Amino acid sequence: MTAHAPDPIHQFEVSRLIKISIGNMDLSFTNVSLFTVVTVVITAAFLFISSSSRGLVPTRMQSLSEMAYEFVASTLRESSGVQGMQFFPLVFSLFTFILVANFIGLFPYFYTVTSQIMITFSLAMVVILTVIGYGFYKHGISFLKLFVPSGVPVVVLPLVTMIEIISFLSRPISLSLRLFANMLAGHITLKVFAGFIVSMIGVGIVGVGGAVLPLIMTVAITALEFLVAFLQAYVFTVLTCMYLNDAIHPGH
C-alpha cells in the first residue's frame, strides 16, 4: 500500500478547543489561543528562572537571558539613544515572545502562532499605535514633521508627503507580512520534504534509498528554520526600534 504524504497546509488549521459564544460573537478558545498562552508561560518561566539565580558564575539560562537583554538594550540605544530605553519593556517582550513562538513551532505537535497573520498583524499594530500615541503625546502636532522631510523643494513636497504617509501606514502590513510569510513558507517547505520521505518509504524497499536525499534536505531545512526563527525575531525587533525612533525624534 502506498503511503500518502500529509497535507503541508493542515498544520496551520485553526481548530476550536472550547466553544465560547457571546451573542453573535465567536470567542472560542482555539489551538492558536492555547499555544499563545503556552508561549507566554514558557517565556515568563524562562525569564523568572534565569533571573532568580544569584550565583557568582552565571548559569546557561542566565547567560541567555542576559544576552537577550543586552541585545535589545543596545539596539534601542543605537537607534533611539538613551530616551529609547523607556520602551525597553515593550521591545523586550516582543522579541522574547516572537523568538519563543518561532522556536516552539519547530517541535512536533506544537503550533506556530506566528504563522497566523492575525497574530503578527496584532503585534505590528501594537508597535505602530505606540509610535503614534507617544509621538502625539510627546510632540503634539509637531509629530507630523515626520511626514514632511526637510530640504525637499516646495514643488514636490505634496507628493513626497503623500509617499511618506503611505509608507508609514504600510509599516504594520510589511512588518506583519514579513514574519508571517517567512514562518509559513519555511514550515510548508519542511512539511513537503518530510512528505517526500513518507511517500518514498511507502513505495517499498526501492523507495527507501530514494528517501535519503529528502531526509538530508529535511535535516538541513530544519537547521535553517532555527536560524530563520531567530532572524525573524531579530528583524522585527530592529524595525520596531527604528519606528520608535520616529516617535522620539520625528524631525530627524
UniProtKB/Swiss-Prot annotation:
<feature type="transmembrane region" description="Helical">
    <location>
        <begin position="117"/>
        <end position="137"/>
    </location>
</feature>
<feature type="transmembrane region" description="Helical">
    <location>
        <begin position="146"/>
        <end position="166"/>
    </location>
</feature>
<dbReference type="GO" id="GO:0005886">
    <property type="term" value="C:plasma membrane"/>
</dbReference>
<keyword id="KW-0066">ATP synthesis</keyword>
<keyword id="KW-0812">Transmembrane</keyword>
<keyword id="KW-0472">Membrane</keyword>
<keyword id="KW-1133">Transmembrane helix</keyword>
<dbReference type="InterPro" id="IPR023011">
    <property type="entry name" value="ATP_synth_F0_asu_AS"/>
</dbReference>
<feature type="transmembrane region" description="Helical">
    <location>
        <begin position="29"/>
        <end position="49"/>
    </location>
</feature>
<comment type="function">
    <text>Key component of the proton channel; it plays a direct role in the translocation of protons across the membrane.</text>
</comment>
<dbReference type="InterPro" id="IPR000568">
    <property type="entry name" value="ATP_synth_F0_asu"/>
</dbReference>
<comment type="similarity">
    <text>Belongs to the ATPase A chain family.</text>
</comment>
<dbReference type="Pfam" id="PF00119">
    <property type="entry name" value="ATP-synt_A"/>
</dbReference>
<feature type="transmembrane region" description="Helical">
    <location>
        <begin position="87"/>
        <end position="107"/>
    </location>
</feature>
<keyword id="KW-0813">Transport</keyword>
<dbReference type="GO" id="GO:0045259">
    <property type="term" value="C:proton-transporting ATP synthase complex"/>
</dbReference>
<keyword id="KW-0406">Ion transport</keyword>
<keyword id="KW-0138">CF(0)</keyword>
<dbReference type="GO" id="GO:0046933">
    <property type="term" value="F:proton-transporting ATP synthase activity, rotational mechanism"/>
</dbReference>
<feature type="transmembrane region" description="Helical">
    <location>
        <begin position="196"/>
        <end position="216"/>
    </location>
</feature>
<keyword id="KW-0997">Cell inner membrane</keyword>
<feature type="transmembrane region" description="Helical">
    <location>
        <begin position="219"/>
        <end position="239"/>
    </location>
</feature>
<comment type="subunit">
    <text>F-type ATPases have 2 components, CF(1) - the catalytic core - and CF(0) - the membrane proton channel. CF(1) has five subunits: alpha(3), beta(3), gamma(1), delta(1), epsilon(1). CF(0) has three main subunits: a(1), b(2) and c(9-12). The alpha and beta chains form an alternating ring which encloses part of the gamma chain. CF(1) is attached to CF(0) by a central stalk formed by the gamma and epsilon chains, while a peripheral stalk is formed by the delta and b chains.</text>
</comment>
<dbReference type="InterPro" id="IPR045083">
    <property type="entry name" value="ATP_synth_F0_asu_bact/mt"/>
</dbReference>
<keyword id="KW-1003">Cell membrane</keyword>
<dbReference type="InterPro" id="IPR035908">
    <property type="entry name" value="F0_ATP_A_sf"/>
</dbReference>
<protein>
    <recommendedName>
        <fullName>ATP synthase subunit a</fullName>
    </recommendedName>
</protein>
<keyword id="KW-0375">Hydrogen ion transport</keyword>
